[in-house]
Curated annotation (Swiss-Prot):
Protein name per the record: RNA-binding protein Hfq
Family as reported in the entry's similarity comment: Belongs to the Hfq family.
PANTHER family: RNA-BINDING PROTEIN HFQ (PTHR34772:SF1)
Lineage: Bacteria, Pseudomonadati, Pseudomonadota, Alphaproteobacteria, Hyphomicrobiales
Gene Ontology BP annotations: regulation of DNA-templated transcription; regulation of RNA stability; regulation of translation, ncRNA-mediated
Function: RNA chaperone that binds small regulatory RNA (sRNAs) and mRNAs to facilitate mRNA translational regulation in response to envelope stress, environmental stress and changes in metabolite concentrations. Also binds with high specificity to tRNAs.
Record key words, sorted: RNA-binding, Stress response
GO function term, MF aspect, one: RNA binding
Cellular component terms (Gene Ontology): cytosol
Pfam family, one: Hfq
Superkingdom field: Bacteria
Native species: Sinorhizobium fredii (strain NBRC 101917 / NGR234)
InterPro entries referenced in this protein's UniProt entry, alphabetically: Hfq (IPR005001), LSM_dom_sf (IPR010920), Sm (IPR047575)
Length: 80
């Protein structure tokens, strides 16, 4: 079995980016953002919605909720 070199945060963000899954991001100040992740790095997430991009700093994010169930690992079955 190959070792997982990515951390969970990067694996999660890369999965929603590749699958173009719409998600909701809640910021620590209570603001709710929705969109699709187009890119991310160690400090920020680029979110796209209605043809506009929005750069969100990770330190401002409280919670990320995908709009559908994710399968991030090969042996993981989708929740019923």
């Amino acid at each position: 079995m190959a070792e997982r070199s990515q951390n969970l945060q990067d694996l999660f963000l890369n999965t929603v980016r590749k699958q173009k899954i719409s998600l909701t991001i809640f910021l620590i100040n209570g603001v709710k953002l929705t969109g699709v992740v187009t890119s991310f790095d160690n400090f920020c997430v680029l979110l796209r919605r209605d043809g506009h991009s929005q750069l969100v700093y990770k330190h401002a994010i409280s919670t990320i909720m995908p709009g559908q169930p994710l399968q991030m690992f090969e042996n993981e079955e989708a929740a019923s």
